[in-house]
Amino acid sequence: MSETRFHGARVRESTGLATAINDVDSSVIGIVATADDADETLFPLNKPTLLTRVSDVLGKAGTKGTLYKSLKAVADQVSTKVIVVRVPDASSQGAPDTGVTSFGHLDPEDRAFFGIDESEDAHPVYPHKTQDQYVIGGTDGDGNYTGMYALLIAEQDDAIGYRPRIIAAPGLDTEAVTKSLCVIAEKLRAFVYAGCHNCKKPADAISYRARFNERELMLLWPDFIAYNPKSGANEVFPAAAYACGLRARIDHEQGWHKSLSNVPVTNVLGISSPVFWSLQSEDSDANNLNNKEITTIIRRNGFRFWGNRTPETKAYIFEVYTRTAQVLADSVAEAQFETIDAPLTPANVKDVLSAIRAKLDALVTSGRL
């Protein structure tokens, strides 16, 4: 039998390269807001809307509610992707009922005309909800997500395709809303920035903070004072909105490993309540707030957030601890999509492990780990 010999070099191309692990986009913001006078086409109720250039749509955000101030605060810090869910403003819907039918003011003849059942088995009508109900949302009778739950479907929406990683409901963040946002954040591997609702002084904020222990949360106190071009006056703007914008800017410029603290906030004039701070003072308001895991605001070459902690006091005590864990988990997991359901061969296992090692080495080299 003859033999065929080749005296040279053969080159074969292969596409079976090791899987590259890329960082997920951690700078996408998700905001729940009210604005009954906003453009209804651009901002439909209870549906996520993607904004790629926030400054271009400020004129359509209305002047009522919280939407304009939230978007203005973000736009002053960064140009990034923002997913907005607009919800009804309860103050313009009338007071919520507490057990009396919405026809309780009608005469008996009118009740009969409208076919109202006044028997003991009749269910009362609740035409209006509280603001917390609108903001938190859930699912309606048709199975559609409403309120903050609409953020869960943003990534699967053909018109959006992004997952919010920084979420807030500026100006609407009551205790119930903040706790619900943390539930959404856990599902999305996102991080929540929220104010200390209705707290007028440091002691109030410290008392309020005792109600939380979520690792996906940073509590902020007080709020900012900024100029409102719509009204022509200096007004209170929610700190949570600025935190979202600044967080996205830091992610763009430095990375998710850098905390929110000690970075100048753009285009603010003051703070809504006085805070005593001195760099070397251990008994200052700022240090007392920080000791209770509340991020405050100081004035030093401009205004800056001051504080790094979450209300979780055992493992994920810092904002960057939580966000690093989130980004690493999602970056590694998303890169393995093609290997799911593939044969568990030694080559595939080696590919997965080598890609993870290479990614971790790269993060250490770049100073992110």
Predicted regions and their residues:
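A glycine- and small-residue-enriched flexible loop/hinge signal that marks low-structured segments
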Residues: 2-58, 62, 66-341, 352, ...
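C-terminal hydrophobic structural anchor segments
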Residues: 346-369
